[in-house]
Amino acid sequence: VQWSAEEKQLISGLWGKVNVADCGAEALARLLIVYPWTQRFFASFGNLSSPTAILGNPMVRAHGKKVLTSFGDAVKNLDNIKNTFAQLSELHCDKLHVDPENFRLLGDILIIVLAAHFTKEFTPECQAAWQKLVRVVAHALARKYH
């Protein structure tokens, strides 16, 4: 994947403002609420019975932060995303058996969260760069499935 200087700047510029804990928690919570079938991968997280329970669940919050922290690895390694996510792809495929479609869904949710948090900075150009990034990350995570 080729990244223009402008795309790199739009991605890293916005990333520098992201509160990883808050945005990660919100993104994962939204995934579990909007796409309830994804909850089956998080059975060990306890109470996921309602949006309120999900939003208040400390395990959802912690894992959301973990997910978005690893997303930061993509931002730091834009030219090597495939290798950056090789181990995570293996884990999600071989051990967790996560449907790779969920990576795309989470990417789309992250776009929504970023747009909600950064209304002024999240221009159409910024969205295009981030949409490309979440697509590349989802593809890298799904790589082990092919």
From Swiss-Prot:
GO terms for biological process: hydrogen peroxide catabolic process. It holds the Pfam family Globin. This is Hemoglobin subunit beta. Keywords: Heme, Iron, Metal-binding, Oxygen transport, Transport. Transmembrane segments: none annotated. Residues 2-146 form the Globin domain. GO terms for cellular component: blood microparticle; haptoglobin-hemoglobin complex; hemoglobin complex. Red blood cells. It comes from the Eukaryota. Heme b binds at residues 63, 92. Involved in oxygen transport from the lung to the various peripheral tissues.
